[in-house]
Amino acid sequence: MLDVIELDFDYHDQPLLQQISFHLPAGGLLHLKGSNGAGKTTLLKLIAGLLNPEKGEILFERQSIKKDLCTYQKQLCFVGHRSGINPYLTLRENCLYDIHFSPGAVGITELCRLFSLEHLIDYPCGLLSSGQKRQVALLRLWMSKAKLWLLDEPLVALDELSLLTIITKIQEHRAKGGAVLLTSHQDLPLNKADYEEYHL
């Protein structure tokens, strides 16, 4: 599904990423690891087409993402440190905004129950905590048809139930042929044989 080939990126004229190469197949999960400042978030932004590399190429389904960036970006969903949530829209409206629904997608209320947010469904998201906004961003992810999920530190500061929910959704997405690339400082609660790791 995704091929990163000999990618280089400089930050303030200093090399940050050099010769980054890996393959992420359909159904795959790649855990991107590295210390703070190693370039994990930058690499996700490069893969999302939000930054341009100095050298190298990114292929999605064997085609360069540069060929039709707009179409490519509709195939992915990027959940980063910023939630991307509109504070003036309600939780429901944020989930519906610019979402490409899958046939038979689970209803918003049912998904909200996974994070015990159903009582806030018609509240403006500006009234939610930062953690709740991040959960809304994840709900949007789960409602999308995106094949490729790019998740920047999705497991930070989660309780055990929320962690289990996210891991379950990741596994469901993979079972349907989707692919997931995530960064995390912590080990994943999965068998090591069930995913790949890439160290920056």
From Swiss-Prot:
SMART domains attached to this UniProt entry: AAA (SM00382)
Main location as per UniProt: membrane
Location in or out of the cell: Cell inner membrane
GO biological process, one term: cytochrome complex assembly
Cellular component, GO, one term: plasma membrane
GO molecular function per UniProt: ABC-type heme transporter activity; ATP binding; ATP hydrolysis activity
Positions that bind ATP: G34, S35, N36, G37, A38, G39, K40, T41
UniProt keyword list: ATP-binding, Cell inner membrane, Cell membrane, Cytochrome c-type biogenesis, Membrane, Nucleotide-binding, Translocase, Transport
Catalytic reactions on record: heme b(in) + ATP + H2O = heme b(out) + ADP + phosphate + H(+)
Signal peptide: none
A Pfam match: ABC_tran
InterPro entries with a match to the protein in the record: AAA+_ATPase, ABC_transporter-like_ATP-bd, ABC_transptr_haem_export_CcmA, P-loop_NTPase
Enzyme class: translocase
Task performed by this protein: Part of the ABC transporter complex CcmAB involved in the biogenesis of c-type cytochromes; once thought to export heme, this seems not to be the case, but its exact role is uncertain. Responsible for energy coupling to the transport system.
Name of the molecule in the record: Cytochrome c biogenesis ATP-binding export protein CcmA
Source organism per UniProt: Legionella pneumophila subsp. pneumophila (strain Philadelphia 1 / ATCC 33152 / DSM 7513)
Gene symbol of the encoding locus: ccmA
